[in-house]
Swiss-Prot record:
A cellular component term, taken from the record's GO annotations: chloroplast thylakoid membrane
Protein name: Cytochrome b6-f complex subunit 4
tRNA processing is among the record's keywords: no
Keywords annotated in UniProt: Chloroplast, Electron transport, Membrane, Photosynthesis, Plastid, Thylakoid, Transmembrane, Transmembrane helix, Transport
Organism: Oltmannsiellopsis viridis
Pfam families, sorted: Cytochrom_B_C (PF00032)
Assembly behavior: The 4 large subunits of the cytochrome b6-f complex are cytochrome b6, subunit IV (17 kDa polypeptide, petD), cytochrome f and the Rieske protein, while the 4 small subunits are petG, petL, petM and petN. The complex functions as a dimer.
Family: Belongs to the cytochrome b family. PetD subfamily.
PANTHER family with a match to the protein in the record: CYTOCHROME B, CYTOCHROME B_B6 C-TERMINAL REGION PROFILE DOMAIN-CONTAINING PROTEIN
Record field: transmembrane: 36-56, 95-115, 131-151
InterPro entries for this protein: Cyt_b/b6_C, Cyt_b/b6_C_sf, Cyt_b6/f_cplx_suIV, Cytochrome_b_C_euk/bac
Protein's cellular compartments: Plastid, Chloroplast thylakoid membrane
Organism taxonomic ancestry: Eukaryota, Viridiplantae, Chlorophyta, Ulvophyceae, Oltmannsiellopsidales
Function: Component of the cytochrome b6-f complex, which mediates electron transfer between photosystem II (PSII) and photosystem I (PSI), cyclic electron flow around PSI, and state transitions.
GO molecular-function term, one example from the UniProt record: ubiquinol-cytochrome-c reductase activity
Amino acid sequence: MAVTKKPDLSDPVLRAKLAKGMGHNYYGEPAWPNDLLYMFPVVILGTFALSISLAVLAPAAMGEPANPFATPLEILPEWYFYPVFQILRVVPNKLLGVLCMAAVPVGLITVPFIESINKFQNPFRRPIASTLFLFGTATAVWLGIGAALPIDISLTLGLF
């Protein structure tokens, strides 16, 4: 346990310093103009200097230039778009695929209205919300893993 010395506010010398705005931040030094005019610009300029020095001294590797005439066989999106990409890839009708994607946020919006009867915060006492969460998480993981696989084994994940 740390022992900290608290200031003696009954000391008239300290009270006079505090009234003038003198002293350390712990004793009530005002943020204006000390912090805002002196400390913040130093931190901001230091951050800019560090960023610029890293960009100049250690630039990120760009890799080989892209060839617009040679595209890969299958273009994959970023990893966080895998479940959405898998929905579009599996559903045969594109309009139906877009409607399936739009159904996800609509379904998430309806969950609080379904659970409005239940006032408990414990997830074990909210079976509908817990079941929907587990089902949605499992479905998103399943679709995400399937999107990284070829189309013929994407639904079964190569298990069957």
